[in-house]
Structure formats: structure tokens, C-alpha cells
Amino acid sequence: AQITFKVELPTALEIIILVFIFSAEILGEISEFYLVFPFWDTVLHTLNGFLAAAIGFSLVDLLNRSDRTVFSLSPLFTAIVAFCFSMTIGVVWEFFEFGMDMIMELDMQKDTVIHTIRSVMLDPGGHNVPYAIQNITDVAVNGQSLGLGGYLDIGLLDTMQDLIVNFIGAAVFSVLGFFYVKSRWQEALYREEKRMTETF
């Protein structure tokens, strides 16, 4: 038998999601807020972790509260599912950014100027030992200085920072969600025990 669910996200969550999309696409890309405000990308990825966890949490909570299914997840499991859902969304988004950079020749994985690099490819002995170049103040490509004041890291630091702040946003919401569901779960158990006691 097929079971259908009427999915209703809280109005406040829907508004926040729309504001997030506007902030990322209209302000971030078109109005170039990513360039004007260096923290813009970090704030949005943190918020993304929070929102994706909220959506994952809402979906699991929908199943928990539905009368059509025998489905009751513990508060801890609900929080874990919300966290994993958020991290999966974050990783898939980074795949999307990488794909757009490779296929469409964009620059969604923003570059970072750094002053130290370490690589085993630079080891003169050809061994698996990281060789460091420190205090980099300029880099030349094909004999032409880039004038950036350091070495240009193409996307790695941006990707890792995005995933880390996504992790933080997801973790914060999952912890808050855990305590919210736990309190509601305990209230439901109390009401059920009270009903059983009154029955007998």
C-alpha cells in the first residue's frame, strides 16, 4: 500500500530558506558580495549547515508524528539523522561547486592567498617527505608575476573551510534539536503512562 505524506515546513523555516537563496545567488553572485565581504561565504555555509539539519530534522519528525506509520525514532537517532543529512547536503554542494569549476570554467571554489606551501612533490630526494616553502611573497606564472602577495591556493582551503563551518552549523542545530525532541518525547511518555494509569 502506498503512503503519502503532506510535508509542511514551518513558515519561519521557509522564509529563512528563501532569504538564504537570495543571499547566496542574488547578493553573493550577482551583487558580488562574495568579493566585497570576505566572510559572506563562511556565514552562508554555516547557515546552510544549520538549515539543512533543520530540514532533515523536520523530515524525520514528520515520520515520527505521523499516524500513518509505525515509526518512532529516539531523540538521539533523530539528531544523528539530521546531522548526517546536513553534512551530505554540504558535501554534495561542494561536488557541485567543483563540477561547475571544471565543466563550466567558473570559480565557485574561491581562491585563497597563502604564504606557505608543503608538498612531497617538491622534495629534492623524491621521497614521501613534505618539503616546505615559507614566507612566499610573490608567485610568477610563465615568467609573469601575479602580484597577489603570496601563493594562490585554488579552492582547497575554501572547500575545507566550507565543510568545517557546515559541520558547526549542523552540530549546533542537531544538539538543539536533540534536547527539543527529548523534552517532547518525555512529555509524550508521561501522558501515555498517565493514560494507562487512569485506564486501570
Region locations from a protein language model:
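Cytoplasmic-side transmembrane-helix entry/capping segments in multi-pass membrane proteins
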Residues: 8-19, 42-45
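Alpha-helical transmembrane bundle and helix-membrane interface signal
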Residues: 60-74, 114-120, 182-186
